[in-house]
From Swiss-Prot:
Its main location: cytoplasm. The gene is ruvA. Pfam families: HHH_5, RuvA_C, RuvA_N. NCBIfam families: ruvA. SMART domains: HhH1. It comes from Campylobacter jejuni subsp. jejuni serotype O:23/36 (strain 81-176). Keywords: Cytoplasm, DNA damage, DNA recombination, DNA repair, DNA-binding. This is Holliday junction branch migration complex subunit RuvA. One of its GO terms (molecular function) is ATP binding.
């Protein structure tokens, strides 16, 4: 099972990239539009990978952010939601918007995602309702890091942008990584 890939992006389409690793192997990876907006060709990146093996395919789904990967994997557990629909949600909603819609039971937010109708939106809300508390805890680390960095005098827009691309988990690690990037 592949859980991570690091390498140079040699080809980029809106939701698909090819990454060439130091070993010489190249991998095709499906990504969200949010991920796509943060990367360029000829840049080196590390991706968290969710590998889906089926009888006729072996696909990699890549994420720069561990929270987005968790969201994708949770959506896959919902009856009737496949990888394409889960990736459409990841491309249409950022992690915080998804968590907020889930915690409020707001089906209208999910219905705006291409491929999700009223029944699917309701099913996602119902089946993931027991994970609401887990979701709220994931974003708490970033909220705490944001508050700490604001007290240090950094501008909110810059902090949010840095935290969105942060790879670290846990409040203290997020703050350390953000401080390095904020200078």
């Amino acid at each position: 099972m592949v859980v991570g890939i690091e390498g140079i992006i040699t080809k980029k389409e809106p939701t698909f990239i090819i990454v060439k690793c130091a070993s010489g192997l190249s991998y095709g990876i499906f990504i969200s539009l949010f991920c796509s907006a943060k990367i360029q060709t000829q840049e080196k990146h590390e991706f968290f990978i969710t590998q889906i093996i089926k009888e006729d395919s072996n696909k990699f789904y890549g994420f720069l952010d561990k929270d987005e990967q968790k969201m994708f994997e949770m959506l896959l557990k919902v009856n009737g939601v496949g990888a394409n629909t889960a990736m459409a949600v990841c491309s249409s909603l950022d992690v915080n918007s998804f968590y907020k819609a889930l915690s409020l039971g707001d089906e209208s937010v999910l219905k705006k995602v291409p491929g999700i109708g009223p029944k699917s939106a309701k099913r996602i809300i119902v089946e993931l309702s027991d994970t609401k508390t887990k979701l709220e805890n994931v974003s708490d680390d970033k909220s705490e890091a944001l508050a700490a960095l604001l007290t240090l005098g950094f501008k909110q827009e810059k902090i949010i942008s840095v935290l969105a691309s942060a790879q670290a988990t846990g409040t203290s690690e997020l703050i350390k990584e953000a401080l390095k990037k904020l200078g």
